[in-house]
Amino acid sequence: MININTSFKRIHSLLILTFLCFLILINKTYSEEKIGSVVALKGEIIAINTDDEKRTLDIYDDIFLFDEIVTDNSSSATIQYDDNSTVIIKSSSSLTITEFVFSIAKKKFLGIVKKGKVIIESGKIAKAQEGSMEIQLPTMILGIKGTRFNMKINPDGTSEVGLSEDSFGEVGTINISSDGKVQTLYDTDQVISANIETGISERPKTDDEKKELADASNDLIEASSIDDNLIQEKLEEKLANGTLLDANNDGIIDLSDIDIIKENIKIEKQENINFIAENSTGENTEFLSNVLNQSDEASIGQSMNHILETNDYLVASVITNLSNEDNTFLTTSNVEANNAIKEKIFTQMLSDTDDENNNIAVIGSIFAKSDAESVALMMDTIQTVGETNAHSTLALEVLSSMADSESFYDMDFGDE
């Protein structure tokens, strides 16, 4: 005779065991969710997962949810998260991201800083109206809305926070909660502190603190730019050191894995440049231009093509900035695919009658530095635009502004 109670208990126990295994699996899955990657580092950086397992981080390594990133007294790291937030972790510091959701339905970024100093340039989550970005420090909780800010935990346990303009010239706000009190930080010249004994206080920001926040721009430019040769070099070092992943899962780690990983890195970086372009204005393209100026020519071309399609009002300002830096994207014909993109750029600039004189001067200065092939290639575009706009002197004006170009005198215009 079947004992129903015994069978039921066995089934019940089996269901409980299955449910517990499911919870463990879910927790493991969430803890292994990639949320960002290391884009720059100095010295030894350690990541500690939820199982208290430690791993040494290398350039381009993935960062997972609940990883505690720890630096020692001579190391630092720059992490770029999947919402385009960039975090600079200074020496003797610790950062853990405990929740990261970036979807249409929900946008949330929660982190904990236990010690040291961290600078954050907020990304899409903090800039979204419905987004929520919170960072917990020992004596305060920060609610951030679209800005660059730094946090520091002093040896006496006091937590401090200050904000500054972000890469786009915007200043957001930080809501600071401590011991039941809430204060909002708007002023870039102030630092707000919270101590268990003395509560919330504020003081002027020092010149060194202002400089440190401003100097973070250099780290952000480096983190965002795309240099194919540099990425290749770093990945080859990882291959030689035995830290490269088997990207194609063929059981062999070799140059084919470098190709896959490099392509993924460049895609992520390109998405970040697109984010930078989307948040730039015609009056403030300095950061975007600096990122492009430190990128390789093919990546500049890809970025400029995206800008032409989505943010064409930025084109003239970016090209003006790049022309002042003698950027080879503008002055050489090394990447064939870029020629068509440059034709689009110059066509738009020369068709803009509102700022025609400035654009002609910029294009002339570019051509004065260009190789003969680049100059010859663009002359057809200039002449075509002049005819289309019924402006017969346009080509002559550009040619006049090119008078200092040695390559101009070497050009062969044919027998016409």
What are these regions (language model features)?
Residues 26, 66-68, 119-121:
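Short, charged, low-hydrophobicity "junction" segments
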Residues 32-51, 72-75, 91-93, 97-100, ...:
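Glycine- and acidic-residue-biased ligand/ion/polar-headgroup-sensing regions
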Residues 2-15, 30-33, 54-58, 104-108, ...:
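C-terminal interaction modules
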Residues 53, 59-61, 67-68, 73-87, ...:
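N-terminal beta-strand/beta-hairpin edge segment
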Residues 23, 51, 57, 127-129, ...:
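A generic, residue-level signal for flexible/boundary positions that often mark functional hotspots
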Residues 63, 68, 89, 305, ...:
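Residue-level detection of beta-strand scaffold positions
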